[in-house]
């Protein structure tokens, strides 16, 4: 069996490719069923965020397993394999384990050390368990990866003041406004007319960061206006006007900055809509939705500047130098956890041999005990029988303790395989299995 991960991220694919592979929560169940339908795939889980789509799996054969996963990805995205493959990465065994732990720790994020990815890995684990697509191996890996992410954030300063996608989007707005005014600094948003489209978690984070950057009023649009009103109640110090998404165009006309973060699988704003507005002032769109909420053709409008998640790199690069130094310490913690998991996984090789040895010894114990009890005759009481049975079980457990502990103890795979072969040969475990 092999652990593999196949996917793509902000490091390997632009947003126009990533958005075609974004798997919303409502499609996860169907996608997991499709992947489990492949005979090579034993366990599987999906991580889908705005910056990555990764499929982790336990497969019988790494080559056919990876091919099956790639086939699914190509069919789901509608991108022919030849065009898709250059954007995909594949990690096997130790590299796959290391990758997931680094992802959980925020070491592979666009925004180094961001905290949201940890909750997304937790959700991946929960969805895998709810859909019964994960088993003992992936569950152990996911649990330990989440634990690793928590450990990195508690034992290093990587997460201290870490920016998120949402805060980077707000800083990008500050930077672009400053650049228009001739400054290469982040300026206050106090005088800007801000529109936020969407009322989910990302929008909540957007509003939190907008408030900290000088914004004191904004318009909040959402398809479900009650959800927008509930979100607005959490920010009593801000003047938030809530409206329905059907008022999108007229509210764009009132804005200087528009942030979008909805779950729509199709763009909600395109050039045709913008051209109807007769804009005369500069307008900035910052779209952190994946799939994108704003069509790429909007960039053709003379008064519009449109940015998506890939454009956040300009802001992120300004903050990375300090975090790169802290990341070294975090990487050493991740490596420790990787070794712990691999030692546990390698120890599973011993389980079939241990079980066979225990089964054979238990059979011998019962046979010899029965012979002894039959010689004792009817005068041997039930209580005495129980004492003798407990005695024989204790002897077997004592005999097994040292070899079982040795087989399960941390050692190289080569050493463990030598030990297993010795035990199999000494106790004729292989020959008996073949005869059976």
UniProtKB/Swiss-Prot annotation:
It is an enzyme of class 1 (oxidoreductase). GO terms for biological process: chlorophyll biosynthetic process; protoporphyrinogen IX biosynthetic process. NADP(+) binds at residues 198-203. It comes from the Bacteria. The record marks 99 as: Important for activity. Pathway: Porphyrin-containing compound metabolism; protoporphyrin-IX biosynthesis; 5-aminolevulinate from L-glutamyl-tRNA(Glu): step 1/2; Porphyrin-containing compound metabolism; chlorophyll biosynthesis. PROSITE patterns: GLUTR. Substrate binds at residues 49-52, 109, 114-116, 120. It catalyses: (S)-4-amino-5-oxopentanoate + tRNA(Glu) + NADP(+) = L-glutamyl-tRNA(Glu) + NADPH + H(+). The active site is at residue 50. InterPro entries: 4pyrrol_synth_GluRdtase, 4pyrrol_synth_GluRdtase_dimer, 4pyrrol_synth_GluRdtase_N, GluRdtase_CS, GluRdtase_dimer_dom_sf, GluRdtase_N_sf, NAD(P)-bd_dom_sf, Shikm_DH/Glu-tRNA_Rdtase. GO terms for molecular function: glutamyl-tRNA reductase activity; NADP binding. Pfam families: GlutR_dimer, GlutR_N, Shikimate_DH. CDD domains: NAD_bind_Glutamyl_tRNA_reduct. Possesses an unusual extended V-shaped dimeric structure with each monomer consisting of three distinct domains arranged along a curved 'spinal' alpha-helix. The N-terminal catalytic domain specifically recognizes the glutamate moiety of the substrate. The second domain is the NADPH-binding domain, and the third C-terminal domain is responsible for dimerization. Catalyzes the NADPH-dependent reduction of glutamyl-tRNA(Glu) to glutamate 1-semialdehyde (GSA). During catalysis, the active site Cys acts as a nucleophile attacking the alpha-carbonyl group of tRNA-bound glutamate with the formation of a thioester intermediate between enzyme and glutamate, and the concomitant release of tRNA(Glu). The thioester intermediate is finally reduced by direct hydride transfer from NADPH, to form the product GSA. Belongs to the glutamyl-tRNA reductase family. HAMAP family: Glu_tRNA_reductase. Homodimer. This is Glutamyl-tRNA reductase. It comes from Prochlorococcus marinus (strain AS9601). The gene is hemA.
């Amino acid at each position: 069996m092999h652990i593999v991960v196949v996917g793509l991220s902000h490091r390997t694919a632009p947003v126009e490719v990533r958005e075609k592979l974004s798997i919303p929560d409502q499609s996860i169940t169907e996608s997991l069923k499709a992947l489990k339908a492949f005979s090579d795939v034993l366990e599987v889980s999906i991580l889908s965020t705005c910056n990555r789509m990764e499929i982790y799996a336990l497969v019988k054969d790494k080559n056919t397993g990876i091919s099956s996963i790639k086939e699914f990805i190509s069919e789901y995205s509608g991108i022919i394999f030849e065009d898709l493959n250059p954007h995909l990465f594949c990690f096997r065994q130790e590299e796959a384990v290391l990758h997931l732990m680094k992802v959980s720790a925020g070491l592979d994020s666009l925004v180094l050390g961001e905290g949201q990815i940890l909750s997304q890995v937790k959700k991946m684990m929960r969805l895998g368990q709810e859909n019964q697509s994960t088993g003992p191996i992936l569950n152990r890996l996911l649990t330990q990866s989440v634990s690793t992410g928590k450990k990195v954030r508690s034992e290093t300063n990587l997460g201290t003041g870490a920016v998120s996608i949402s805060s980077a989007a707000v800083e990008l707005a500050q930077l672009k406004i400053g650049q228009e005014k001739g400054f290469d600094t982040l300026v206050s948003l106090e005088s800007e007319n801000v529109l936020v489209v969407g009322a989910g978690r990302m929008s909540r984070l957007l509003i939190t960061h907008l408030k900290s950057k000088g914004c004191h009023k904004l318009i909040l649009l959402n398809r479900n206006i009650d959800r927008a009103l509930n979100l607005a109640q959490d920010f009593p110090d801000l003047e938030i006007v809530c409206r329905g998404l059907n008022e999108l165009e007229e509210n764009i006309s009132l804005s200087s900055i528009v942030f979008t973060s909805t779950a729509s699988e199709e763009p909600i704003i395109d050039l045709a809509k913008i051209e109807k507005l007769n804009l005369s002032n500069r307008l900035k769109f910052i779209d952190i939705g994946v799939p994108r909420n704003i069509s790429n053709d909007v960039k053709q409008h003379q008064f519009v500047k449109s940015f998506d998640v890939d454009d956040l790199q300009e802001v992120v690069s300004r903050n990375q130098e300090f975090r790169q130094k802290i990341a070294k310490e975090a990487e050493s913690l991740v490596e420790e956890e990787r070794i712990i998991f691999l030692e546990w996984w390698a120890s599973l090789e011993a389980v079939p041999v241990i079980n066979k040895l225990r089964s054979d010894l238990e059979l011998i114990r019962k046979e010899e005990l029965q012979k002894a009890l039959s010689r004792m005759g009817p005068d041997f009481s039930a209580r005495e029988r129980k004492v003798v049975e407990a005695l024989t079980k204790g002897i077997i457990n004592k005999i097994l303790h040292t070899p079982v502990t040795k087989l399960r103890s941390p050692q190289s795979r080569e050493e463990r395989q030598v030990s297993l072969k010795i035990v199999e040969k000494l106790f004729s475990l292989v020959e008996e299995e073949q005869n059976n």
